[in-house]
Design a protein with these regions (language model features):
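Secondary-structure transition/turn motif
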Residues: 50-51, 105-106, 137-144, 186-187
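Beta-strand-rich interaction surfaces with strong enrichment in secreted/lumenal proteins
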Residues: 34-35, 89, 138-140
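Intrinsically disordered, low-complexity peptide-like regions
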Residues: 24, 104, 129-132
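A generic structural signal for beta-strand entry/edge sites
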Residues: 44, 97-99, 131-135
Length: 188
C-alpha cells in the first residue's frame, strides 16, 4: 500500500473530523431515540496545502490520478508528529491470525493491546509490517469476531482514501489546489 507523498513543505497538523454515524429519530413524545451504527468513528483528515509549490502539487495530483485512481485505491497517511493514541482499531479476531498491524510508524515499544477491551499481552515489532508499519503479535490468536484495539505513542498512520473528485485550477502554468485535501479513513 502506498504512503501519501512527502512534500517539500511540512504541512501543519491536520484537522480531524470524527463521525459516529448515529441514527437519531424523534419520537412522538418529543424524546430522541439514538442508535449507534459504528463501533468506532470514521474520520476525515483535512490536510492543509496553502502556499505549496508546483512540484508538491503535481506530486499530489500524480499520486491521486496514477497511484490511487481517485477514490479507488487506499493508501497510508503518516502524521509528522508522535502523539499518544488510545484504543485505536487494529482489526477483528478470526481464531487464526496472531499478528495485527498497528496504525502507527515509529511507535514506542510500550504499547497496550486489548481484545474486547481486556488488556492482553503481545510482542511488539517496530516497522515489521507492510509499508514499515508497526505490528503486535499475540501468543494465541484472538477469538473469531473479537475486537482488537491498541494504545500507543507514535506517528498515527491511518489507512485512507481520496474523495473521488478533486478540484484543480490551472493558473499561469502553476497548479493550485483548494486550501486543503480531505482524506477519508477506511477499515478493511
Amino acid at each position: 500500500m502506498a504512503l501519501f507523498p512527502t512534500l517539500s513543505h511540512t504541512h501543519s497538523y491536520p484537522k480531524v473530523e470524527e463521525n459516529w454515524n448515529t441514527i437519531i429519530s424523534d419520537m412522538q413524545s418529543g424524546k430522541e431515540n439514538r442508535t449507534q451504527v459504528w463501533a468506532f468513528p470514521k474520520r476525515t483528515i483535512s490536510v492543509n496545502l496553502p502556499g505549496h509549490i508546483y512540484a508538491d502539487l503535481k506530486l499530489i495530483r500524480d499520486f491521486y490520478n496514477n497511484t490511487c485512481k481517485g477514490a479507488r485505491y487506499t493508501f497510508r497517511f503518516k502524521y509528522d508528529q508522535s502523539r499518544a493514541y488510545a484504543k485505536e482499531y487494529a482489526g477483528l479476531g478470526d481464531s487464526t491470525t496472531k499478528t495485527f498491524t498497528i496504525p502507527s510508524i515509529d511507535a514506542s515499544s510500550n504499547i497496550t493491546a486489548y481484545v474486547n477491551d481486556v488488556v492482553t499481552g503481545t510482542s511488539f515489532g517496530d516497522g515489521t509490517g507492510s509499508d514499515g508499519l508497526d505490528q503486535m503479535t499475540f501468543a494465541s490468536a484472538p477469538a473469531n469476531g473479537s475486537v482488537v484495539t491498541v494504545s500507543f505513542t507514535g506517528k498515527w498512520t491511518p489507512q485512507v482514501r481520496f474523495p473521488d473528485k478533486l478540484s484543480w485550477q490551472q493558473i499561469t502554468s502553476l497548479v493550485s489546489l483548494t486550501e486543503q485535501i480531505s482524506l477519508i479513513e477506511v477499515r478493511d
